[in-house]
Amino acid sequence: MRLRSLTVWALPPALLAAATAIAMPLLALTPPLAPDQAMQPLAQVNAALQAGEADKALTLLKSLPSSDASQGEAHNLECRVRIMLSQWNAASDQCQEAVRLDGQNSEYHMWLGRALGEKADRASFLSAYSLAKRVRAEFEESVRLDPRNAPALADLGEFYRQAPGMVGGGIEKAQGVASELDKVDAARAHELRGQIADQQKDYSTAEREFKQAIAASAHPASQWISLASFYRRRQRWTEMETAVHSAETAAEHDKHAGLALYDGASILIETNRDPALASKMLEDYLAGSSKTEEAPAFVAHIRLARLRDRLGDAAAANRERAMALGLAHDYKPEQDSKH
């Protein structure tokens, strides 16, 4: 247990005995911390995580008692902070500890699968082979524990779609996951089928599925970005930009659309298109209330700094870099490849 240092003042023995006699019954009457009170610090950590305040989240985590019953969630949250910082080894270790403490938690297995997947992407061939099998096992376990966990189903479907058969992948398996997604998240099901069709070079079917995902979604801004990404891969630049504009329009009426603004700006930056719109989308994302760990605010500041440099505003670029550093001083900008 981590304890703050306490200053103990010297008292005369008689006074100390009297104070102890009074205090002990009072301590016995003190009720244990309610579960919701115990979770409040973790809620603060999660709020910092979603806001992209990596340094604050880690500081809050360090202040938690190590014997607390919520340690599984604390390790899961630290794993996600480390993922946000691109610290894959540390992330994997923290997520593994969360699973060890609570092996029946679907979310913990999903996040461990994600951390291991990032690690596998950067590993040698032999290491990647063994890691990929672990990724599959974690996603499968996450779905087994909660068959209605739509993000875990989508991750499993993407693994099956991309991975070779030697590590348990396969298009037929991915199609089976799409059928399961139909029951819980139709938009994700259409997106997965779109990715499968795209991989099989059935581009007309892929485009149709991505458009059906837009129609099926209650929050279509992100699905517009998926369609824009498809057009980008096909080098259909005008349609890509139109889809990004549609995502921005949808985001104006959707408080959950922060990720779409971030991803839309990323597409424009990567394709050297419309830097003014890319800047606006990042500004709107950072000024809004829908920031998310999937789109770290400090990375958004770094990308905005690069756009400011391109537009010739060095002072504004430096301000953005300073804000990024204030949120995550350990993050290395070169880790972000979205120039």
Model-flagged regions — what are they?
Residues 67, 101, 145, 181-184, ...:
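Structural marker of alpha-solenoid helical repeat scaffolds
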Residues 25-84, 338:
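N-terminal leader/linker segments that initiate helical-solenoid repeat arrays
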Residues 63-64, 97-98, 141-142, 180-181, ...:
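Canonical positions in the second alpha-helix
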Residues 77-80, 111, 155, 192, ...:
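Canonical tetratricopeptide repeat
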Residues 82-100, 104, 108-148, 154-183, ...:
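Short coil/linker segments at helix-helix boundaries
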